[in-house]
């Protein structure tokens, strides 16, 4: 891109950020809660399956609610996992490539790892069998797996005697882009169907309708596509009018100024397409495609586009003809990386395919709207009763209709999202968004779509979006950030079970399940529950628990929930806080050494809460807000005094503000010790310490060689007298009073106060104990 182009991109991107910011809360990029892998395990909210062989190389997953199993395809293996707990009771099928095939594959120049048998296809074939296809050392083949009826003895057996060639059903390359859908006994697949990965095509095979595909080497149909998803969606009650939709990205022919421009497409064809009689024989005669747009409106009509589709999710509704389509997109710019989620209604998609065709007279002409006569039956329509019933199959269509469809596969009108803009935009660059799953939830104040977004670091974001019709702004609320795997790993597959309230997540090396919610984690007070804004959770008068819109579990008198506004003050007015949990303010005593640094720690549970510090210098003195400067700094961890003064002594109040709800989280009394008194301590007779009956014990839970947290912090902020301060702290901790406390049993000493135990167990961050406070 030329320098001028770089400047334009920078300006557009800056405007995008400016445009998007007003619709968000104070910290839109922060999740409200951040849970580590360790915390998820301790909450019993997750379960992890890892192959006993040490590798998995997951490529596909299939959720089977009927069999209550999750089927996983990897390298040389197919696994059957328990939906209740994926780490328990797994079964496996070992299905490697033959030694002869592997040797041939390597001799042709492929890497030995690529010459394994990677399972790429898993579909329900009927109630007792699965269809599976695998790469077979660059010689794809398919077979059936017998799983039996749900009521029978569990079965999991590969019927290898029914193996068939898999060309056109499964790619040769294990890493090639690929999608497939089984409709009846017909397998529809979008793939690269040759050994060298050059022949991109959409196939139908296996069933009674016969083998059919897109034309070879016709860039008007497919130009270097990356297949993302495929679904069968009916248009009406006539099954002969059913259509297959393929979602993919490709190089756009109509972007004449840049041959490398990527667009996202929706391709459509009739399930019962038989091809033409004289033209397009055994080729799709109803294939059409339209551009799928996801963009943010910009200055002077110049939009910022997210052109590359990463994932697509179809959310079923009560009407099977009108599911909601969610697309996860990213930018194709080499300068900036951004991601967006757009939502599409089927009415917009059908409108584009029923609209005008795109047309180009010749190489010297531009693409334009076709204004000539359109033949009958309309190109792209199915042979059905809805279409007049005049034609039994597409083979009966007139040649001019087939010829027109062949020359005009592209629709002129693009498909635009709901509200004509994304529901979610992420431009912080923290991680790349890769996978998307959606659950629709009924809450007290309406219906919400909860987005679960998988990233390239093993993080899953749980997000809701709220559209304000008056201002036309979209508020995104990141409810949780979940670290699914212990070690960062890209999420490559996600399956969702609304019935079980579980999300199943696959990486290359492991499969995890995680519950949608854990309501009592939010806190034991009404305000805690309402501030969470989680549509799965509500205050029932006793605790924060699962919200049930109707039925026996509903407690209409006591439910308190406000997802749209999070107005805890209004919702919880008159509610008694259990154990006065919210009224109770944690009190601490802290010491600071004059002219050195001190941190008053306060980390609210919610990362979206604003923290305000107040100080009171005497009992009868009014509280004042702490003024920060180059000496007193407000940090995420608390209030940092770079150089403590005697005048800083007082009582400090850490208050959080979230949706206008104010809560005092912590009260810290700071006592400042004069530096010369600390110096005097080191001139005392050291013999006194040698006569102590009990030596100063090491910090609980700290292994030998582990550096206490405060040492790292003191070195980080640059204490001028680090060694003396360290010695002073050890002397303070080793007083006779402290030794008496340490004589208690370890379990009693660690959590002498039940309230402290509860607070510690629900703490957001795990770290070494800080036995620094004397009361």
Curated annotation (Swiss-Prot):
Main location: secreted
InterPro entries: Ig-like_dom, Ig-like_dom_sf, Ig-like_fold, Ig_sub, Immunoglobulin_dom, PSI, Semap_dom, Semap_dom_sf
UniProt cross-references to Gene3D superfamilies, sorted A to Z: Immunoglobulins (2.60.40.10), ligand-binding face of the semaphorins, domain 2 (3.30.1680.10), YVTN repeat-like/Quinoprotein amine dehydrogenase (2.130.10.10)
Distribution of this protein across tissues and organs: Detected in neurons in the thalamus. Detected in embryonic vasculature. Developing lungs, developing skeletal elements and ventral horns of the developing neural tube. Correlates positively with tumor progression.
Knockout-associated phenotype: Embryos present defects in the patterning of intersomitic vasculature.
Location in the cell: Secreted
Pfam families, A to Z: ig, Sema
Binding partners and assembly: Interacts with PLXND1.
Record-stated family: Belongs to the semaphorin family.
Protein's recorded name: Semaphorin-3E
Organism name: Mus musculus
